[in-house]
């Protein structure tokens, strides 16, 4: 843990030192669902697993649904952070994502842990810092790829006041929204480029492309 009591950059209205606190002092945890292969079906209750977490986002990937009558764990809530706590791949331990909107009929799997806090956007940003990665590395089991509740209880972080937490959380929420917006623009441009590459070059057997700049009408020549 660093001895610095304040960050190098902060909003100007805040001057108080950050306090060193245990993770369990400012978050609560909830467990995932244990199910059997016979509980799985084509639809029902969605069970979020490590495959549903990618780059800090919840994604549709290798979705698993179980019969609703076997569900004995609570539904995820908006703001919850779900964390991979056990996996065959050591590098996936600690991977996490925040639930950005209400997801009905959705729980987490047994190899996940849910985290709730008073300021989830700040907590999510905190878990994105290198310090959280360091805490995971220090507390992870030597032979089993997992983080237990006891290991979480040993983790410590510097924490600001709740008002500063909210300001920081809002700042990173806005950054995430901006990144998402530009990502969508990027994906659209990639699709435009792919389409233009297909239409601005002649297809097999054709001498002119489907789309070309006006002012050009000559056939394209076959050349080596």
Task: For each feature predicted by the language model, list its residue ranges.
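A short glycine-rich beta-alpha junction/loop motif
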Residues: 3-7, 106-110, 141-166
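Extracellular/lumenal glycan-associated surfaces
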Residues: 7, 166-178, 182-185, 221-223
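Charged, alpha-helix-forming regions
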Residues: 10, 139, 197, 204-212
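Non-catalytic DNA-recognition/assembly elements of restriction-modification systems
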Residues: 10-32, 212-224
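DNA target-recognition patches
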Residues: 36-67
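A short beta-sheet element
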Residues: 49-50, 61, 67-130
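Extended intrinsically disordered, low-complexity coil regions enriched in Ser, Thr, Gly, Ala
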Residues: 179-194, 202-205
């Amino acid at each position: 843990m660093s001895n610095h009591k304040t960050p190098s950059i902060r909003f100007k209205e805040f001057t108080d030192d950050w306090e060193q606190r245990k993770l369990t002092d400012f978050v609560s945890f909830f467990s995932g669902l244990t199910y059997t292969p016979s509980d799985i079906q084509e639809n029902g209750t969605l069970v979020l697993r490590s495959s549903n977490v990618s780059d800090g986002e919840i994604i549709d990937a290798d979705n698993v649904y179980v019969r609703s009558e076997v569900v004995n764990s609570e539904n995820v809530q908006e703001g919850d952070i779900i964390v991979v706590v056990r996996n065959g791949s050591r590098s996936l331990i600690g991977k996490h994502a925040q639930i950005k909107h209400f997801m009905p009929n959705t729980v987490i799997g047994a190899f996940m842990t849910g985290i709730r806090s008073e300021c989830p956007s700040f907590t999510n940003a905190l878990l994105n810092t290198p310090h959280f990665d360091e805490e995971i590395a220090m507390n992870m089991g030597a032979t089993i790829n997992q983080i237990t509740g006891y290991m979480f209880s040993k983790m410590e972080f510097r924490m600001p006041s709740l008002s500063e937490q909210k300001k920081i959380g809002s700042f990173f929420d806005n950054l995430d929204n901006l990144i998402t917006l530009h990502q969508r623009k990027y994906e659209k441009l990639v699709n435009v480029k792919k389409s233009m590459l297909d239409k601005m070059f002649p297809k097999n057997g054709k001498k002119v492309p489907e789309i070309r700049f006006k002012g050009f009408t000559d056939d394209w020549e076959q050349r080596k």
